[in-house]
A protein has these predicted regions:
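An extended, acidic
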Residues: 19-27, 31-226
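Glycine-rich active-site/cofactor-binding loop and its immediate structural neighborhood
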Residues: 1-26
Length: 226
């Protein structure tokens, strides 16, 4: 993370089903914050399937541990909060930004000059993106790269870096916290538990956000041709 902000150690454990093992088979997941050199606090979050989420904050100097409350946002809209599509790597950032802007204009057709309508946080860490939703900072994060890049390849554009299953191995924590997580086609999130498969995801803080964003986002993606 270039010492700009926290990175995350991610781990998920699943029964070994050989080549058929999938992310949905993960039964235990843990993520530990690796803070910057200027920070003395580190959060660890973990979940066991069907048993909810637990978390604690460790003070790295005193070694004191305190319970950490995990509570995704209960907001009914992304307006006024943090919500974004991941576009920290080229190519296709123009396409993703265009989709975002169209989505916002549909939600707020009568923009007030000078008003901050929505915020974005391009956190270059899938673990960091999940964390920000889990603690209530972000309301929606989407990663459409695995869906967008094959489309761009048909136009002769070289694809960029994408998310992989090991980046998403702690999504069980989000599910246990009550978040809505789908793949980038709006289907149940899942993928082979390997290191090569390209994956995408849509991470909604709650059902209200899902109902507001997904139907519109689905149509806007289709209008862009991918």
């Amino acid at each position: 993370m270039y010492d700009k902000r926290s990175a995350f150690f991610l781990a998920g454990a699943a029964p070994n089903k050989g080549n058929t093992t999938r992310l949905s088979d993960i039964e235990v997941a843990v993520m530990t914050e690796l803070p910057t050199s200027r920070s003395v606090l580190s959060d660890t979050l973990w979940a066991i399937k069907g048993q909810g989420v637990q978390a604690e904050t460790l003070h790295l100097e005193t070694l004191v541990r305190k319970p950490r409350t995990i509570k995704p946002s209960g907001a009914h809209t992304i307006i006024g909060g943090f919500a974004q599509l991941a576009r920290f790597f080229p190519p296709g950032r123009d396409v993703l930004a265009r989709i975002e802007d169209k989505l916002i204009l549909e939600l707020v057709p009568n923009l007030v000059p000078g008003r901050a309508i929505i915020f974005e946080d391009q956190y270059i860490s899938t673990g960091g993106q999940l964390y920000e939703v889990l603690v209530g900072h972000d309301r929606f994060v989407g990663d459409l790269r695995s869906r967008l890049y094959p489309y761009l390849q048909t136009k002769g554009i070289v694809p960029g870096h994408v998310c992989h299953p090991y980046d998403a191995c702690t999504f069980l924590i989000g599910q246990e916290a009550g978040c809505i997580i789908t793949d980038c086609f709006g289907e149940a999130f899942d993928a082979p538990l390997d290191v090569l498969t390209d994956v995408g995801f849509l991470l909604f803080a709650n059902q209200h956000i899902y109902q507001e964003v997904w139907p519109r986002l689905k149509r806007l993606i289709s209008e862009e041709g991918f």
